[in-house]
Swiss-Prot record:
Superkingdom of source: Bacteria
Covalent S-S links between cysteines: none
Keyword GTP-binding on entry: yes
Protein name in UniProt: Nucleotide-binding protein lwe2422
Organism for this UniProt entry: Listeria welshimeri serovar 6b (strain ATCC 35897 / DSM 20650 / CCUG 15529 / CIP 8149 / NCTC 11857 / SLCC 5334 / V8)
An example Gene Ontology molecular-function term: ATP binding
Length: 291
């Protein structure tokens, strides 16, 4: 059986240049991320990853916090270059001296190479030690004039998978009586619609049942609301994606999360599915039946 091809991104560069933001961005893109792995463990780590059938994209932050970094990084990279089941890309982050000094002053941290001395001396020493590694990097990003959001957007543009954009919309119905979902990005209240709960034969059913679904959908206000809601979502979703979000949770609530919210979540989910990867769930639909 042929070995699977693994993707490795090594995040390195100047201290204070944004390596943490880069790692978080790659994690959002589906990469398994490891912070501060000693270079000498890199080949052994990859042998373990090769055996895993769940991981094919790995991002490693490697920098001078590992004291052996400068002695062992080059041999480790040479060994990776000779490994045929790994595609390696080195991402090097840097920033101008003035910007790095300012960032250190804001955080009141010491530079790791000059813990008791001048921050600028530490920056200069680090820049010199990293010069060879910067030269063999496939992607160098200067973050001097970048806000964290802009760096995330740049990382997304560089590393998003070619076959499919990484953006998932999660549609969730819920009941207000059980609380608003804490992970919801957008919440819509549909308690203004006629309630099937007050019709005896529909009370034990849910919005997944045909009778309830058709009852909820027959009202003019339902159709008007759905048209406006879907139009709003189709307008705003591309902008959420542009801002670097890889997941958006949309919660639609009624009183108990049984009828109206379930029916509308199903309808909206099917509309969104035509353009975006979409997951539909009903948080509170089974609560009453379970009692």
């Amino acid at each position: 059986m042929a070995s699977k091809q693994l993707k490795l991104v090594i995040i390195t560069g100047m201290s204070g240049a944004g390596k943490t933001v880069a790692m978080q961005s790659l994690e959002d893109l589906g990469y398994f991320c490891v912070d501060n792995l000693p270079p000498s463990l890199l080949p052994k780590f990859w042998e373990l990853m090769k055996e895993s059938d769940k991981m094919d994209k790995i991002a490693l932050v490697m920098d001078l916090r590992g004291r052996e970094f400068f002695d062992s990084i080059e041999p480790a990279l040479d060994e990776l270059d000779n490994t045929n089941f790994i595609t390696t890309k080195i991402l090097f982050l840097e920033a101008d001296d003035k910007v790095l000094v300012s960032r250190y002053k804001e955080t009141r941290r010491h530079h790791p190479l000059e813990p008791n001395g001048s921050v600028l001396d530490g920056i200069n020493a680090e820049r010199e030690l990293l010069s060879d590694l910067k030269g063999r990097s496939q992607l160098v990003i200067n973050t001097s004039n970048m806000a964290p959001r802009e760096l995330r957007e740049r990382i997304n543009n560089e590393f998003q998978t070619e076959d499919k954009d990484v953006f998932n919309v999660q549609l969730m119905s819920f009941g207000f009586k059980y609380g608003i979902p804490i992970d919801a990005d957008l919440v819509f209240d549909v308690r203004f619609l006629p309630n099937p709960h007050y019709i005896d034969k529909m009370r034990p059913l849910t919005g997944l049942d045909k009778d309830v679904y058709e009852y909820v959908m027959k009202w003019p206000e339902t159709g008007a609301f759905l048209d406006k809601l879907i139009d709003l979502l189709m307008f705003t979703l591309p902008f959420y994606k542009r801002e670097g979000k890889t997941q958006l949770v949309i919660a639609i609530g009624c009183t108990g999360g049984q009828h109206r919210s379930v029916a509308l979540t199903e309808y909206v989910g099917k509309a969104i599915q035509q353009k975006y990867e979409t997951t539909i769930s009903h948080r509170d639909m089974k609560r009453r039946k379970g009692r």
